[in-house]
A protein has these predicted regions:
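Structured mid-to-C-terminal alpha-helical surface segments
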Residues: 43, 153-170, 210, 214-286
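Conserved NTP/Mg2+-binding pocket subregion across the NTase superfamily
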Residues: 91-198, 203-206, 217
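Active-site nucleotide-donor binding segment shared across nucleotidyl transfer reactions
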Residues: 35-83
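Glycine/small-residue-rich interface belts in oligomeric ring/scaffold proteins
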Residues: 74-98
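Acidic, Ala/Val/Gly-enriched low-complexity intrinsically disordered segments
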Residues: 5-8, 12-15
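Helical scaffold of the NTase/Pol beta-like nucleotidyltransferase catalytic core
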Residues: 14, 18-50
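Generic structural signal for hydrophobic core residues of well-folded globular domains
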Residues: 72, 118, 203-206, 210, ...
Length: 286
């Protein structure tokens, strides 16, 4: 259970984030996209990393857009007032056009919103805790020290549900989303191989998480995922592999080392302490 660390890792000066050399340059590059997106609180971002296929190790040449994810701490007036800002989404492709390889997506969550999703076992939210290419603030380092608070067996139905959605997308039993289908992929390979890759990726992640309490990023089976994504497997083969992995995840859950449910009071304390310490630091640095 989290009991607070007296500000260790949180009360430090945030400007520059203590990064050096090329790490600082890469952080500045990512922050530039956040500013280009006209996010109103770039100095409140406590965690920022490149997600998507690059995070998982399944990127194929220059076919993917750039996905930037992050967490921010809102100013007190947004948290305590009437107008909140739980998340921020922006894309160079806008709301209608499908993304191309030159596009950039920025997805940011408030700390409270991210923690709420992570408590539910949301796969995207849990990736934030394991992103190896991340640039972090002292506040986020505190969360990494207590990441096990967010790792429970409640993640299993979330991962399996996301994987099933991708499987249905692959087989054509589910809508393709507001930005439309991927006709060029289906025409080339005969089915949606990107959805196939995501199906297997989610299942491998789920199995590892409930068995070992971690998610390795990039994925150890990234070469296999790339082969799936480039059409080296038939759809029937992918369905068979997915079926075996679904069963493996259920078996792993039955023997899981993870607790069955979230310690919500501990998470609430960690989140509340982080907000207070961040705001206090901002006051001190004025």
């Amino acid at each position: 259970m989290y009991r607070g660390e007296g500000g260790v890792g949180i009360g430090a000066e945030l400007e520059g984030w203590g990064l050096r050399g090329n790490l600082k340059k890469s952080m500045e590059d990512l922050l530039k996209y956040v500013r280009d997106a006209e996010f109103s609180y770039p100095h409140s971002v406590i965690h920022l990393f490149v997600g998507g296929s690059e995070l998982h190790g399944a990127k194929v040449n220059e076919t993917d857009d750039l996905d930037i994810y992050g967490v921010y701490i809102e100013p007190p007036e947004l948290v305590l007032g009437l107008e909140g800002l739980p998340h921020f989404v922006w894309s160079t492709a806008g709301n209608e056009r499908r993304n191309g390889p030159d596009d950039v997506d920025v997805t940011l969550y408030s700390l409270k919103k991210w923690a709420s999703l992570a408590c539910k076992g949301n796969p995207t939210a849990l990736h934030f805790l394991f992103s190896s290419n991340a640039q972090r603030s002292p506040v986020w380092e505190e969360f990494l020290r207590h990441k096990r608070l967010f790792l429970t067996q409640t993640c299993v139905p979330q991962f399996l549900g996301f994987a099933d959605d991708q499987l249905k997308r692959m087989t054509g039993r589910r809508g393709r989303g507001k930005k439309g289908q991927r006709p060029e992929i289906e025409e080339r390979y005969g089915y949606d191989v990107k959805a196939a890759m995501h199906t297997l990726r989610l299942l491998y992640e789920c199995q590892e998480l409930v068995t070992h309490g971690t998610i390795t990023l990039p994925r150890p089976e990234k070469d296999l995922l790339i082969r799936v994504r480039t059409g080296k497997f038939s759809m029937d083969r992918v369905i068979s592999m997915a079926s075996e992995l679904f069963d493996a995840c259920e078996r792993a859950k039955a023997q899981s080392i993870l607790p069955k449910k979230i310690d919500r009071p501990a998470v609430s304390k960690l989140v509340a302490d982080s907000y207070r310490m961040f705001w206090d630091t901002k006051k001190t640095n004025r």
